[in-house]
Amino acid sequence: MSASTLNDSDLGRLGLETPISRIDRALKQLWEGDEAKTRASLINLAIYTEDSSLLASDNDLLDHVAAEHACRALLILALPESQPPRARAWIQALCRPYQGKQAVCSEQISFVLEGGDAAQVQNIVFAHLDSDLPLVVWWQADLTQHFEERFYSRIDTLIIDSSRWSDPAKQFDALREAMSAETADFDVRDLAWTRSHFMRTALASCFQDAAALQKLAALKTIRITHLKGRRTTALLLAVWINQRLKTSLQLELIEKDSGPALQSLVLEGDGVRGEVRRDCDSSFINVCTSCGQHEHKDLLPADVDSDAELVSEQLSRFHGSTLYSSMLPFVRSMLK
Amino acid sequence: MPELENPFQETLLSRHRAEPCTVVIFGATGDLTHRKLIPAIYNIAACGDLPPQFKVVGFARRDKTDEGFRTELEEGNRKNSRQGHNDELWGSFAQCIHYHRSEFEDLEGYKALGCLLDQFDVERGAPANRLFYLAAAPEAFKPILEMIRAAGLNKGVGDKWARVVCEKPFGKDLATARGLNAVVADTFAEKDTYRIDHYLGKETAQNIMVLRFANSIFEPNWNSRYIDHVQITCAENLGMEGGRGGYYDTAGALRDMVQNHLFQLLTLVAMEPPTDLSADSVRDEKVKVIRALRPLVGPEAVGKNVIRAQYTAGSVDGVSRVGYRQEDRVNPESKTEPFVALRLMIDTWRWQGVPFYIRVGKQLPKKATEISVHFKKPPQVPFATSTMLRNSENTLVIRIQPDEGIALRILCKQPGQAQNVQQVKMDFRYSSSFGKASPEAYERLLLDAMAGDATLFARRDEVENAWKFIDEIEHAWHKSDNPPTMHEYPAGSWGPKEADDLLRADGREWRLL
């Protein structure tokens, strides 16, 4: 990808272009003399991408996330193949109104790094963190040599979206290797997995029905309808179901060209059926459990869907989980 | 058949999830149900945290259909729901709402309620837990509890539980609280009794324990060696609007606020670290604080340590206000206090010699509840003698409402050649740092009651010991031959001069909120 693919209007939205060596001074000036703004920060949130077409949407995403999670936001667009090498930076305040008069603001520093290497990315990130605050990185690119030990050993939370990976099998291997490194101590939050949260919650609700619960052992099949490009989410969901049931149900995946990432989940067996369905444009999901003559229906809120909302949701969950890592070998085997 | 665990529940939640449950609200046509309880349950549903196959039954005297009841509640929800009102969600949620008409003293009505609950269980395919919420007037608690017992509804079906949630006021003195506790104990075990105090459901109240016990910098200083005194203020800028004078004039600030809400805050500030976070470990430590309060016995001790007052005509925010005795539904000869300030001592090693000043009042200049912990001054401050430093001790302020947060006042050097020292404030605001709105106190407390976590509910001994302490003061005020004076303050001021004198006598003053 070359620098020429950079869109001037996208760059213009990043705020005030500032020489990298003067970022701290420029940030200070940004706040000086404006008593109506309160600066707040609880985390460092960095987005790393190698796709210049994502610059505008990532910029919007940070604006959305910062409204709920006060942060020092870093947006890094790395274009390793681009020549000649050049590094540019922009600063801006992400503000939201507070009590009518004041604005609560987070800082965003954006970088476009052309022709740089892994060390340059690390230096840039580590030089501009708000000290003592946790570092959350959403690594949007593939886990290549830029994602290396000296970098991930400093990360507290790594956000990925495995459904974006062009070669999921290879990327899952790279992820597992990083997670098993001696110095790695980061939580992994996979947005592909987060997207299934509402389905999992609804499924739990489905089988809270006493009659259906008694028939769990009779379940035989899983049928998941998902949006094209969200196969990993469907696979992760299927692995989770099999793990929970300690079995291996027959899996059928149905791909659709439009609609929500996950559209329906049906578990079926002799005399028992649990269905979770989310219709297009609905913020709710329909849950239906049938067991012989007995039928139970419910309406539950659907989880958020956009990347910004998913990231925001993840930042609200500070507890890590070993569940995801325990599923990786199974997902990896299904990708063979 | 042994009960199966739902394998899909595990791994999903960071908190204990409630199992299928029916909530029965007694006094369902009242203000609390419309303004707080149903909007709280609706918001729990909107967050997806409501247990599956949930039902709520409104129990009251008036004749209504399910549909009529739902329509009334919908109106209340539109006005009061924290997350707004969604017609689609309400449409589904409303199906779980039912109405049951009965007199509180009519056993047949309770038997019919039992049949309705059984019918729900049949529809569910299994028995569910039952939570009885007493939102009726306190005088109705006794007949309701007796009828619940007589109808056999106080026992869960199979291995399911039956619990009761009691709204405040829990008694009006020690004798009535004990009487009520006895009735409750005849019907429900203490572990199934949840006495609600909505202050404990507030995010900042819950944060007091986290602040104290998760931060190593505070706890070593949290004692009489480093803390000079503690102030707890609960100010309201309203009077007796909306007809509340009728109830309030029978209670007063001491019974209405201090015995429950402010004592709960006091115990959270003063308690020893619990051995764990189980409900009883936390409540064991809280009750020790109440027991250690130095009793104020007799009019002299009460007069010296407690200031009561009524407001006279004045203005708040530029709006004229009548005096307390001129308020709607207030006795013109009333001896009830809408303001009280107390100096309390806690006789423990940790708090020896550290006064806790509490004040609560109506028609004060602003609405605010906060705790301020005033640290001792260093033995010597060699820098400056400015009058600006008169009240320059480090102060940790925990704002309960509004603008929830924590502030720490410290001293810093002013820029310049001279060694001038200036107070600065490090301020943490929940709303600035966490964009998401906190759940309403009732949402948290209802979910806790459904999930069986009693940590944020008052235990019997807590309530009775608090009343025991309060009764001595009430006795000195109303039953002694030489009762302490009822002072006055103009509406819109920070209370009577005598409340200021209470601290001034100790060389201190109230924090300016």
Where are these regions (language model features)?
Chain B
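Secretory/organelle targeting and membrane-embedding segments
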Residues: 1-166, 170-513
